[in-house]
Curated annotation (Swiss-Prot):
It comes from Mus musculus. Component of the ribosome-associated complex (RAC), a complex involved in folding or maintaining nascent polypeptides in a folding-competent state. In the RAC complex, binds to the nascent polypeptide chain, while DNAJC2 stimulates its ATPase activity. The keyword Nucleotide-binding applies. GO terms for molecular function: ATP binding; ATP-dependent protein folding chaperone. Its main location: cytoplasm. This is Heat shock 70 kDa protein 14. The gene is Hspa14. Component of ribosome-associated complex (RAC), a heterodimer composed of Hsp70/DnaK-type chaperone HSPA14 and Hsp40/DnaJ-type chaperone DNAJC2. Gene3D superfamilies: 3.30.30.30, 3.30.420.40, Actin, Chain A, domain 4 (3.90.640.10), Substrate Binding Domain Of DNAk, Chain A, domain 1 (2.60.34.10). Belongs to the heat shock protein 70 family. InterPro entries: ATPase_NBD (IPR043129), Heat_shock_70_CS (IPR018181), HSP70_peptide-bd_sf (IPR029047), Hsp_70_fam (IPR013126), HSPA14_NBD (IPR042049).
Length: 509
């Protein structure tokens, strides 16, 4: 049976299909295996992908980019605030939710971020259907390890709205390991794997323990100040300085000219991963003046040396955080398009001279391929009633419940620390005054620092219409079960009356 894996990144999206025992990436209608995660709006239509990217220079205020950065977030979220401040497309808050205010020239449209993501997922579904047919809609969708529950939910709902049957959300580093069959080739062995993902806007690092075919995240770290776009911007700034040197005009304050240079720099960056030099030509960059500049790989590496240093220092910091040395790492998996850069690969190899550097699968395809393999496993399980051949067993963040201490201050209790092997079950007794007729159990997630400022509420269970007691306390027993597939089931029971309520929250495994 056929199945689909989709990776929606900040700057691009990619779809792979699992069929006849193997997973392969599918090229879109433009012949490209990776599609820009960009949506352009006009009065009559929405355009997704390369065409939207090409038209952005002319229609920047009606073209949405990097929607993943704002998906499922509120205006109070620092990352959303940063996105809003940098977005060329106006973002407003309406009825407590963020919306794009898009001026098409003929009318103004309010668009939900989830609708933008839905259009990108629809493009991925259309691409997959070109080889599988329209009956194949079972999908596994990848999510970053540091995504909160609201972001995961928004991503899954957008995929569902596009017509996909979402089998599971899977963390990106887990998908990368699946793509290489790590843990399946020697299912009884134990190893530590570094997953290095340099995406369009961030660097994500994870140390994974592989033991008896099962994965566990030991530590993870994401840096938003290093990404493929930062390498592109560095090269574009150099091109702008060269134009100023040659033509005595600084275009760095001209948004349209800089967007042209960014596009040219991006093409050159890709070329320099395989060639010793690249030509950057921009037609009519400023006041009709064409610009032609040749950039060598050596020049590019010199310009980007501060970014390379940030990447290697991030690896060293993650090792310190884990309590590891380089000798404790057995394999390194490269993900994300910018991890193709030869200089970066050499620097990583220098850090781990005795370690296999896995890059035989194109780095921008490895995550969707792993997702497609997981989808194939799940579809096969449904058809054969067999067990999963791969278990992804790890909670991503601390899961906490909120209570109140004797002084009335909020108190958070960690029930599932990040990295908890799954499945897992916990019990928690919540005490409330007997005189109240309703009790609310609030669930939070955090990065593990156990600070109230770090925690984000993602679900709650409310017991209502309880019989009041004249005095004393009421005991509410909460039973939380996190399954192997990542879903969290919560049941709250009033110990006096037996009245109970239950919810299920989907969590990426």
């Amino acid at each position: 049976m056929a199945a689909i894996g989709v990776h929606l990144g900040c700057t691009s999206a990619c779809v792979a299909v699992y069929k006849d025992g193997r997973a392969d990436v599918v090229a879109n209608d433009a012949g490209d295996r990776v599609t820009p995660a960009i949506v352009a709006y006009s009065e009559r239509e929405q355009v997704v992908g390369l065409a939207a990217k090409q038209s952005r220079i002319r229609h920047v205020s009606s073209t949405v980019v990097k929607v993943k950065q704002i998906l499922g977030r509120s205006s109070a979220d620092p990352q959303a605030q940063k996105y809003i401040s940098e977005s060329k497309c106006l973002v407003i808050e309406k009825n407590g939710k963020l919306r794009y205010e898009i001026d098409t020239g003929e009318e103004t449209k309010l668009v939900n971020p989830e609708d933008v993501a839905r259009l990108i997922f629809s493009k991925m579904k259309e691409t997959a259907h070109s080889v599988l047919g329209s009956d194949a809609n079972d999908v596994v969708v990848t999510v970053p390890f540091d995504f909160g529950e609201k972001q995961k939910s928004a991503l899954g709902e957008a995929a569902g709205a596009a017509g996909f049957n979402v089998l599971r959300l899977i963390h990106e580093p887990s998908a990368a390991l699946l793509a290489y069959g790590i843990g399946q080739d020697h299912p009884t062995g134990k190893s530590n794997v570094l997953v290095f993902k340099l995406g369009g806007t961030s660097l994500s690092l994870s140390v994974m323990e592989v033991n008896s075919g099962m994965y566990r995240v030991l530590s993870t770290n994401t840096s938003d100040n290093i990404g493929g776009a930062h390498f592109t911007d560095t090269l574009a700034q150099y091109l702008a300085s060269e134009f100023q040197r040659l033509f005595k005009h600084d275009v760095r304050g001209n948004a349209r000219a800089m967007m042209k240079l960014m596009n040219s720099a991006e093409v050159a960056k890709h070329s320099l991963s395989t060639l010793g030099s690249a030509n950057c030509f921009v037609d009519s960059l400023y006041e009709g003046q064409d610009f032609d500049c040749n950039v060598s790989r050596a020049r590019f590496e010199l310009l980007c040396s501060p970014l390379f240093n940030k990447c290697t220092e991030a690896i060293r910091e993650l090792l310190r955080q884990t309590g590891f040395t380089a000798d404790d790492i057995n394999k390194v998996v490269l993900c994300g398009g910018s991890s193709r850069i030869p200089k970066l690969q050499q620097l990583i190899k220098d850090l781990f001279p005795a370690v296999d550097l896995l890059n035989s699968i194109p780095p921008d395809e490895v995550i969707p391929i792993g997702a497609a393999i997981e989808a194939g496993i799940l579809v096969g399980k449904e058809s054969t009633s067999g067990d999963d051949s791969v278990m992804i067993e790890c909670s991503a963040k601390d899961i906490l419940v909120k209570g109140v201490d004797e002084s009335g201050a909020d108190r958070f209790t960690v029930l599932f620390p990040s990295g908890t092997p799954l499945p897992a079950r916990r019990q928690h007794t919540l005490q409330a005054p007997g005189r109240v007729s309703s009790v609310c159990l609030e669930l939070y997630e955090s990065e593990g620092k156990n600070s109230a400022k770090e925690e984000a509420k993602f679900a709650q269970v409310v017991l209502q219409d309880l019989d009041k007691k004249e005095n004393g306390l009421r005991d509410i027993l909460a039973v939380l079960t996190m399954k192997r597939d990542g879903s969290l089931q919560v049941t709250c029971t009033d110990q006096d009356t037996g009245k109970c309520e239950a919810i299920t929250v989907e969590v990426a495994s």
